[in-house]
Structures are given as structure tokens and as C-alpha cells.
């Protein structure tokens, strides 16, 4: 069984037992969180597609950890002007483990 849910402006395809990195959520490590913005739920033979959300669809997950992603380097450069600017950014994330999916 798998589901597609929305969190942090992004859509994630998950199955029970998978670990997913989401945009940072203000939830303590070890707590359980429920996602109710489920767009699709499918088991072996049936597929429930929401319009836009699946009625009664829910994805339950446990927060594993919080952290920061690898650094992304941004370089701005102006040709022939001896000007360049180098910046970096590390995005915060929350890692969750999917425990249950229901339609």
C-alpha cells in the first residue's frame, strides 16, 4: 500500500516503513504526526484518487530527527568587471518514518 501526501508545498510518495525528509516541522523528536492532505491512496487492486483530497485519507508518521541538508553553493558573477560573489545555504529538514496509511 502506498500514498501520496502533501507537506511543505511538496508531494511525497510513501509506503509504510519508509523514511522521508520533509521541510522543517515544529514537532519534537519521537512524537507522532498525522498528515491529512492525502492526494492518493493505493493498495494492490484499488486506487483512491482525491479531488483534490482523499476523503478520510491519513498518513501517520513518527519524527526521527531534525537536521540540515548538504550545503548548496550560489555563485554570482559579472563578466569583465572583476566581481564575483559566493554564498551558501543549508536547508533545515525533519526526517519522519511512516508508520501507517489509511484511506
UniProtKB/Swiss-Prot annotation:
Keywords: Ribonucleoprotein, Ribosomal protein, RNA-binding, rRNA-binding. Transmembrane segments: none annotated. Pfam families: Ribosomal_L21p. One of its GO terms (molecular function) is rRNA binding. One of its GO terms (biological process) is translation. InterPro entries: bL21-like, bL21-like_sf, Ribosomal_bL21, Ribosomal_bL21_CS. PROSITE patterns: RIBOSOMAL_L21 (PS01169). GO terms for cellular component: cytoplasm; ribonucleoprotein complex; ribosome. Belongs to the bacterial ribosomal protein bL21 family. Part of the 50S ribosomal subunit. Contacts protein L20. This protein binds to 23S rRNA in the presence of protein L20. This is Large ribosomal subunit protein bL21. The gene is rplU.
